[in-house]
A protein has these predicted regions:
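Conserved N-terminal structural module of periplasmic/extracytoplasmic solute-binding proteins
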Residues: 10-105, 163, 336, 408, ...
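Extracytoplasmic/periplasmic substrate-recognition and gating elements
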Residues: 63, 67, 158, 236-239, ...
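Short helix-initiation/N-cap motifs at beta->coil->alpha
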Residues: 77-83, 168-172, 244-259
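Alpha-to-beta junction loops
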Residues: 84-96, 184, 259-269
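Hinge/lid segment of periplasmic solute-binding proteins
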Residues: 96-147, 288-289
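Extracytoplasmic/periplasmic solute-binding protein
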Residues: 138-142, 147, 171-223, 232
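Glycine-centered hinge/linker elements that transmit conformational signals in sensory
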Residues: 216-246, 291
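Long, aromatic- and glycine/proline-rich binding clefts that accommodate carbohydrate-like moieties
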Residues: 289-290, 339-394, 430
């Protein structure tokens, strides 16, 4: 069942529930002279951004919530990420918005104070930790994501080899592709953002150090140069094309090279498993691969909270807001409507409800499970700041493209990355 079909079923359920609860409420009205036991009416506001499907899902889940708790009314606003209402009582937030600074600590309620309302035990501790700043839980994670390898095994079969599981096999695959299939075939292809993630994974694997800790870059320019040489080796061994050769309009899954199998692998978000599979002209060979251990010091790479729900510190009814958050993420009724509209649920009960409703793609679960079982590091909140990660003008894209195209040496590129990242981190620390 897809999200749209499930939404139609959910809407019918909401209507039936509303009638049932209304009848119940009429029967239970206080007799003359008796004190009313009905709570005082409460109005909450909630904001989010996303596509039409996400908006429809939120609206239907909120209708179910209002039908269940008829004394609470939820007024909603939605649009784009740039114009989200920052004053709403309950906010969908990008995890990086928390900023891990004093400003965000003052904007949102510490949800630890409402652990009697929100069942925090349903969420992974690592995701809760990622939403915690100076001991305050500023948001509850809706979903956690990370990158993993996807392979088109049909192309590998044509080359006479298996999809790679080690760095050595990856390098060998590049040369085999060139010799057997030709110059236009590559085992891997990915954009600058994915290459930056892959480089950090390599460095963390070989050094055992997190990329950033305590708002400090943990790598010197010389160490970053080693990571850039790793990317360069992948290009030189025909594992992946240069960024100049790979320039495309749109995402990789939209390119003929991915669709027809010339690009036989990528390093992408677990949530995109079905996107890459369904884009293939022959999807029978699609495989969720294993993470590759590039070194023996750690399992490099990281997971990140995709989206979270926070309660504004200006909220006049924080307990009722917490009840709404718990309904959407943990309760069967809410979570079975929300499904995967905001990513694969991190909540155990939420994921179970979404799965029972037929809204969870097994490929995404497989990709998420493999990624989560491997990676040792959380994502630093500044890693995806616009100054660094924006495409095409962010530091990562500019430097990695110039290095890939030969406009910068690995030494020059490493120095620019170290200086630019340190400048962004210094700005965060100074706030």
């Amino acid at each position: 069942m897809n999200q749209t079909t499930a939404n139609a079923a959910a809407l019918a359920l909401v209507g039936a529930l509303a009638l049932q609860l209304a009848a119940c409420g009429t029967a239970q009205q206080s007799a003359p002279g008796q004190a009313s036991t009905q709570p005082e009416p409460v109005t909450l506001t909630m904001s989010w951004w996303g596509d039409d499907a996400r908006t429809e899902t939120y609206q239907q889940a909120i209708q179910a919530f209002e039908a269940k708790l008829q004394y609470i009314t939820v007024e909603t606003t939605y649009g784009t990420i740039a114009d989200e209402d920052q004053t709403a009582d309950v906010m969908q937030v990008d995890w990086t918005w928390l900023g891990h600074d004093d400003k965000s600590a003052n904007q949102f309620v510490d949800l630890n104070e409402y652990s009697d309302v929100i069942d925090l035990e349903q969420f992974s501790q690592s995701a809760l930790d990622a939403c915690t700043v100076d001991g305050a839980l500023l948001a509850v994670p809706m979903s956690v994501t990370g990158r993993i390898f996807y392979w088109n095994t049909r192309t590998f079969e044509q080359a006479g080899i298996d999809a790679p599981k080690t760095y050595e096999e990856l390098l060998t695959a590049g040369n085999t592709f060139r010799e057997v299939l030709g110059e236009e075939y590559y085992p891997l292809a990915m954009d600058a953002a994915a290459r930056m993630n892959l480089m950090v994974s390599y460095l963390e694997s070989t050094t055992g150090k997190a990329w950033v800790a305590d708002r400090q870059l943990q790598y010197s320019a010389d160490e970053i140069k080693t990571g850039l040489e790793f990317l360069q080796a992948l290009e030189e061994n025909h594992v992946m094309p240069t960024l100049a050769a790979q320039q495309t309009n749109g995402t990789l899954d939209q390119t003929p090279m991915w669709q027809n199998g010339q690009y036989a692998g990528t390093f992408a978000w677990d949530a995109d498993a079905e996107t890459y599979r369904s884009a293939l002209k022959n999807a029978s060979g699609f495989l969720v691969g294993d993470e590759i251990a590039f070194g023996g010091q750690a399992n490099g790479g990281f997971s990140k909270v995709y989206l979270a729900l926070a309660i504004n510190s200006s909220c006049q009814h924080p307990k009722e807001a917490a009840i709404l958050v718990n309904f959407l993420l943990n309760e069967d009724m809410g979570a079975s409507i929300m499904g995967t509209a905001c990513g694969l649920p991190d909540s155990v009960t939420g994921r179970a409800a979404a799965t029972a409703a037929g809204l969870v793609n097994p490929l995404v679960v497989e990709a998420n499970n493999r990624m989560m079982a491997f990676v040792d590091f959380p994502l630093d909140p500044t890693f995806e700041s616009p100054a660094l990660a924006a495409v095409p003008d962010g530091l990562y894209a500019a430097v990695l493209t110039a290095c890939s195209n030969g406009e910068l040496t690995t030494t020059q590129a490493a120095e620019q990355l170290a200086e630019g990242i340190t400048a962004v981190l210094s700005g965060v620390a100074a706030e």
